Every structure is written in C-alpha cells, then in structure tokens.
Amino acid sequence: MESYLTVIEQNGQLLVDSREVAEMVGKRHTDLLRSIDGYVAILLNAKLRSVEFFLESTYKDATGRSLKHFHLTRKGCDMVANKMTGAKGVLFTAQYVSKFEEMEKALKARPSLIDTYLDMNEDERAIAYFTERKAKRELQEQLTLAEPKVEKYDRFLNTDGLMKIGQVAKAIGIKGMGQNNLFRFLRENKVLIDGTNKNAPYQKYVERGFFQVKTQETSVGIKTITLVTPKGADFIVDLLKKHGHKREIAS
C-alpha cells in the first residue's frame, strides 16, 4: 500500500478526504461515494446525524468541473473500515488511527494563534502572516498534484481506460509540458525508450501497470502506440514534481 492519508482540521473537526481513502483501499472513488451515500441514507433513516461521520463537499478537477467528494471523520473511517476484510482493511485502519492520533497530539501541543501573535512585535507578525500564507499555497499545490486519482482523468480516458501521452499532458496541465516535451522528459528519465522503439515504455513500467502498448493499422503500415493508465499518469505527475515541474497555483 503506497498511499498515505492526510488529516486536516476544518471547523474544529479532524477529517480525511474520500479520494485518498479510495486510493488507499484500492477502490474507484465513484464506488466509494456510492457506498458512503448508502451509509448516509441508513443513518438519516434512523434519525442519526450523518455529519458526525461524513461531510459532503465538492472539488474542482483539472478541467474546472465541480465534482462530489466526502470528508470523513474518525467515525466515518471506522464505518468504512468495518465493511472491509483482509490486509487492505487492516492497513487502512492502522493508517487512519495513527494519523488521527498524530494530528490530535499536534493540536494539543500547538500554542493558540492569539498567544503566538501577542508575543510578537509588528515586524514579526508580518513575517508570520506571510509565512502562513506561503505554507497554505504550498499545501494547496500538494493537494492539486495529488488530487482525483480517477476523476482527474475521466474525460481523457478511452473505452479501455487508457490515455495517449498528449492527453496526459493536457490532464496534468503543467505549463510548458505539452506532448512533445513530456515525451522528451520521459525519455530523458528512462521511462520511455530513446532510439529503436522510440517512445515505447521500458518493460518494468509496463509490468507495474503504468503503460500499455497497442498496435494500430495506418496507411503506411502497423504503428505502435504507447498508452498510459490512470496509475501511470499519477506516476508521471510524481516524477515531474520530483524534478521541479509544478502547476502554477494562484495565491
């Protein structure tokens, strides 16, 4: 299990994002949403407060569409975990219990914002203010780069759930990283082959489920096409980030 949960504080509640939960437990986000909708309906029918478990919200995908997701409280995570069996359920439980406890300890140890500002002079307050804004921008950037594992690519996927490299470039939306530059970047980083079989993926990345290679008949013969899975697109985003290529996030 390579995914990790991020616990956030919102209006005094500690929450995790259903998109991260779906990735961690190996489910499509749409399937998890369907399950949560079912849990919410049962809770409401029993006249229980569903907001103590799940808080419905929206986010914008790479194309600007508003899509549904949920924030899960610790109780909500308990409910999802209770429906799971096997190693994924155990690992998910271990992750969210640990992350919630870490966040709770951090909040208890954190001095109040008012106390902090009272101890500062005017210059220090200004520095603290802009430092906090910078931290928020960096957090937003991280969330954007890590966002919607399935929904992010929906409009670019073909009927087999695959994308061409040019479609990946459009989906991730990094300035200056169009199709040709993305091909070049992947060749330079030994993800795609340079030379014979140019732009075909190395076998180890095919075996990891990042790429598929298809053949297509053209007027000049058979052409080989490299296609990317959603998992492969996320791998490419992480690789770009590692090499300093980031989306421009508005302040």
Curated annotation (Swiss-Prot):
GO terms for molecular function: DNA binding. The keyword rRNA-binding does not apply. Signal peptide: none annotated. Keywords: DNA-binding. The keyword DNA-binding applies. It comes from the Bacteria. It holds the Pfam family Phage_pRha. This is SPbeta prophage-derived putative antirepressor protein YoqD. It comes from Bacillus subtilis (strain 168). The gene is yoqD.
